[in-house]
Curated annotation (Swiss-Prot):
CDD domains: cinA. SUPFAM superfamilies: CinA-like, Molybdenum cofactor biosynthesis proteins. Pfam families: CinA (PF02464), CinA_KH (PF18146), MoCF_biosynth (PF00994). NCBIfam families: cinA_nterm, molyb_syn, PncC_domain, PRK00549.1. This is Putative competence-damage inducible protein. HAMAP family: CinA_B. It comes from Listeria monocytogenes serovar 1/2a (strain ATCC BAA-679 / EGD-e). InterPro entries: CinA (IPR050101), CinA-like_C (IPR036653), CinA_C (IPR008136), CinA_KH (IPR041424), Competence-induced_CinA (IPR008135), MoaB/Mog-like_dom_sf (IPR036425), MoaB/Mog_dom (IPR001453). Belongs to the CinA family.
Amino acid sequence: MASAEIIAVGTELLLGQIVNSNAAFISQELAADGIYVYHHTVVGDNPTRLKEVIEIAEKRSDILIFTGGLGPTEDDITKQILADHLQKQLVEDEYHMNKINEYFASRNRTMTENNKLQAVIIKDSVVLNNDYGFAAGMYLKENNHTYVLLPGPPSEMKPMFTKYANPLLLSENGNQNILESKIMRFFGIGESQLAADLNDLIVNQVNPTIATYAGDNEVVVRITATAKTKEEASSLVKDTEEEILRRDGTFLYGYGEVSLPELVTAMLLEKELTISAAESFTAGLFQAEIARFPGISKIFKGGMVTYSEETKQSILQVSPQVIKEKGVVSAECAKEMAENVSRLCKTDIGISFTGVAGPDSLEGHPAGTIWIGLSVKGHETEAFQFVYGRDRNHNRRRAVKQGFQLIKQFLDAN
């Protein structure tokens, strides 16, 4: 089985100015191909150190995948150093050169000479077209190694890898069996707890394999099976999926790449249920999230951010008595906020968020104490309490996702 190493080139990565998300993406894709990634390497824009990294990687990996260093500036050195190492010439790729010329001509701008560097490739390499930029990618086999050169910006790298590089890698190095994969998404359970629940499956895994990943306030489980036929592979995945659901199915919210907010929004659109939101400590995060999706104007009528007691009373019409006797961090306040925003915006559903974002306490409640109110036409209004940690922004984001989960649970049950 072929082994791969991902080499990210860029001093900005070493300085922590940019997160190396490219390596995570490529590793996940290669895992699905049956190509094992054993090393991630990050090296700055230094010719000597990059050459050292290449020499080390060749001793331990069959496939070397580079990201970054293909641009027009002096510190973009990846292809120059690799070409020198392989004793290969650099030549101009006509397609990318024409693309660069046409770009500047169409804007009536003079092209600087260094822009031509983006169209330069290592001789004898397969050119990987850049559909979203100018820097050409490369795929090259030499001395029993495969070299893949990809641009650094994820918006250029991901489509180039998916459309051009990965099919070549898969055809030449991938698992010859049929590979089937399924992604399960969980909310409301931590990665450590989920991993503990599935520990015997993970420890004894052979085929399928199970991997857990911590996402943004969620946990992702990836099941991957290989077999001679698609039917066999699918059956292996299904058996494992059913066992996982038996243990932790109550926390599952969906499959694949669809996020919880996206899934809930689609459900609301399908059911043609309108929604509004009243937010205190989340300060509009829920509304900003739901507004990201196309067609949302059909169901999202609006909302209110009422951060202070005064605006809760004057704008959202929360009872002064409730605030005085129960406080803003209470089930009663959350219920009134949800009911009133639904009434004022004339929607089927009203959701509210009130609580203590942190790090300080409020009204005697510790940081991370939150209430979410849910008012649905024809149903009794409910309020749900959750207690998180002291991280202010983490609490706000988690509460928003929790709100979407509560809506999903209602829609699933009704």
